[in-house]
Amino acid sequence: MQWASILLLAGLCSLSWAQYEEDSHWWFQFLRNQQSTYDDPYDPYPYEPYEPYPYGGEEGPAYAYGSPPQPEPRDCPQECDCPPNFPTAMYCDNRNLKYLPFVPSRMKYVYFQNNQISSIQEGVFDNATGLLWIALHGNQITSDKVGKKVFSKLRHLERLYLDHNNLTRIPSPLPRSLRELHLDHNQISRVPNNALEGLENLTALYLHHNEIQEVGSSMKGLRSLILLDLSYNHLRKVPDGLPSALEQLYLEHNNVFSVPDSYFRGSPKLLYVRLSHNSLTNNGLASNTFNSSSLLELDLSYNQLQKIPPVSTNLENLYLQGNRINEFSISSFCTVVDVMNFSKLQVLRLDGNEIKRSAMPADAPLCLRLASLIEI
């Protein structure tokens, strides 16, 4: 059966039997000769928020079309721009501001990014409770100068940008309406279990590039969370339980050394997991840790693995470069190898390990028949 399968595959690849006898690793060489590129399917770091009301030029949008600019409403703070064409947006970014100006009640989108603001005083948004979007990234805000209830009255707030500041803890309480919370590039060291309480509508949480050592069970109540980014922190263990709706998990550049058995079972929609640049060893991984049928991409590069961990046959991209792997076990990809059972893996990176091309077993072409790139 094995020889028949090899003959069939060789015919599909336009390779002769003579070629196979001459080089038992013809299949590996064939893949290396194919033109393949690695495209990151998702960029998890959108540092600058998309502005729904584009305001280009000092004279405003109307000026670009040849019509004279309309006068700004009288309630607009003199430090800011309030384009008449977009009456619910207020632009106060890049003005060297050291304080938050008055916000008119009609505003829904306010931009205070890239200033020298160090505090968010209590009641500063009480006049504009209909706010949907607040951008405060790129300032000098510290946790001790954030009003305790400064966001509590904003019952419609959906996006809050507080990244690139000097925060040491997550502001609380936050409105239930919040969908995106950007707290990356701060100095947050821990996430208490109740820090994110009530945020049942939150879909994206960015906490990368902080000093977080533990998060406990703070993520369990985030039932709508799709994206969680905790990369570039000081975590030694993964969060205690993941939200059931989670699709993207980023934990690279931490100090994680183990992942519990069936850890991802409670997140049946999980597609992308990145755990590169940690301290993972095979002793810290159970046999079913990554055997999740929903996973499409798994990045375990630059750890301390010596063996390829078992993965689901549905996995499409597996990155294991920069480990200490010294053997190629086909059972990590296919528990049964035949014509009807095979892996959907398309990209496999094993470069920078202790494994050689000759370590690939003879039945690898049958199991990994869909692979377009294998690097050793």
Swiss-Prot record:
SMART domains assigned: LRR_BAC, LRR_TYP, LRRNT
Location(s), subcellular: Secreted, Extracellular space, Extracellular matrix
UniProt keyword list: Disulfide bond, Extracellular matrix, Glycoprotein, Leucine-rich repeat, Proteoglycan, Pyrrolidone carboxylic acid, Repeat, Secreted, Signal, Sulfation
Residues with PTM Pyrrolidone carboxylic acid: 19
Gene Ontology, cellular component aspect: extracellular space
LRRNT domain boundaries: 67-105
PTM annotation (Sulfotyrosine): residues: 20, 38, 45, 47, 50, 53, 55, 63, 65
Gene3D superfamilies per the UniProt record, alphabetical: Ribonuclease Inhibitor
First and last residue of the signal peptide: 1-18
Listed GO biological process terms: collagen fibril organization
Location, primary (coarse class): secreted
Residues with glycosylation annotation: 127, 166, 201, 291, 341
LRR repeats by residue range: 106-127, 130-151, 156-176, 177-198, 201-222, 224-245, 246-266, 269-289, 294-315, 316-335, 344-365
Disulfide bond sites: 334-367
Function of the protein: Affects the rate of fibrils formation. May have a primary role in collagen fibrillogenesis.
Subunit-level organization: Binds to type I and type II collagen.
Protein known as: Fibromodulin
Primary gene name: FMOD
